[in-house]
UniProtKB/Swiss-Prot annotation:
This is Enolase-phosphatase E1. The gene is mtnC. It comes from Leptospira biflexa serovar Patoc (strain Patoc 1 / ATCC 23582 / Paris). It comes from the Bacteria. Monomer. Belongs to the HAD-like hydrolase superfamily. MasA/MtnC family.
Length: 247
């Protein structure tokens, strides 16, 4: 069946991994304590944070324990029990830990997006996008193909990356944006939901990613997939999918 929709990952696909890990993540870490002093977490966010925190207290991860010892959080809190309500200071330390672990955690991604928005709007951040991206997106549109985004970063963060890119505002090239609200990127059902939202057969969608497990999940629905091997991308396990060095 003819491809009518491109579904594109961001990190390692349209933007360098280094930009995300060396610019965006450190900026969020540097500003998260200040931001959480002013930002009111929603009731749902608090609940999700506490649930995730409880999972980590029983994981025994040395980095987790060390993170809280450095911040003088009582060790008994880590080993024995978690209070019903976490202080904002503790949440900011926990989010620093999650950033370091590159955890795909909804509330963190939402708050990161808001912090990055401040950075983009102040001019402190300018996103790096691969040079071949605008032409590829424009050529697709000229051929009658719509472009969409699917990233673990929040939809707000996705808009910001393309709005404030070094190549100009690229949002004109995209129709829809999807984040983990539709599900994890390694889950088949996530791609089924995206196809359903677009009201097309999965076989009419081509998914571009740098991660084989994501490609496998998408391909299991009938989507066509392409693996991007950009500079700085991680080596992938053997797979049957086509590999592109560039668009």
């Amino acid at each position: 069946m003819q491809i009518k929709h491109n579904l594109l990952d961001i990190e390692g696909t349209t933007a360098p991994i280094a930009f995300v890990h060396q610019i965006l993540f450190p900026y969020a870490t540097k500003n998260i304590h200040r931001f959480l002093k002013e930002y009111q977490l929603t009731e749902l966010q608090w609940k999700e944070v506490q649930t995730e925190f409880q999972k980590d207290t029983s994981s025994g991860d040395p980095l987790f324990i060390e993170k809280f010892r450095i911040k003088n959080v009582p060790s008994g809190l880590i080993v024995n029990e978690v209070p019903n309500t976490l202080s904002k200071d503790m949440v900011s330390v926990y989010f620093e830990y999650l950033i370091e672990k590159d955890r795909k955690f909804g509330p963190l991604k939402e708050i990161q997006g808001k912090i990055w928005k401040e950075g983009y709007e102040s001019g402190e951040i300018k996103s790096t996008v691969f040079d071949d991206v605008p032409k590829f997106l424009n050529d697709a549109i000229q051929s009658g193909i719509q472009n969409h985004v699917y990233s673990s970063g929040s939809v707000e963060a996705q808009h910001l990356i393309y709005q404030y890119s070094v190549l100009g505002d690229l949002r004109q090239y995209f129709t829809m944006y999807f984040d983990t609200a539709v599900g994890g990127k390694r889950e088949k059902t996530s791609y089924e939901r995206i196809a359903s939202t677009l009201a097309v057969s999965p076989s009419e969608i081509r998914f571009f990613t740098d991660i084989v497990e994501e490609a496998e999940a998408a391909n299991a629905t009938g989507m066509d997939v392409v693996i991007l091997n950009r500079p700085g991308n991680l080596a992938q396990k053997p797979h049957p999918f086509p590999v592109w060095e560039h668009f």
